[in-house]
């Protein structure tokens, strides 16, 4: 079962439809306790990095996501979700990320 993390800023339906069309089983995860029902995770995202991290924090997703990935559960970040896997982002000021991927999201110089 592929869990799609629903923290209020994702393109959930598009990601779910893509997985289903590839014949994958999908569970939209809106409660961190449901992560343990999944074999892998997708972290989608549309919007600003800081707000996304605030949403993940207020929904209490950060520790369960990090723990599951550290225990070997695969995770795929889509759009903003990939940025969130990094250590930080400088979008609208430096904000700490999940730290699951080494590196920081930085602005490309003109």
Spell out what each predicted region is.
Residues 15, 41, 52:
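Conserved S/T- and glycine-rich ATP-binding loop of Class I adenylate-forming
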Residues 2-24:
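N-terminal beta1-alpha1 ligand-phosphate binding loop
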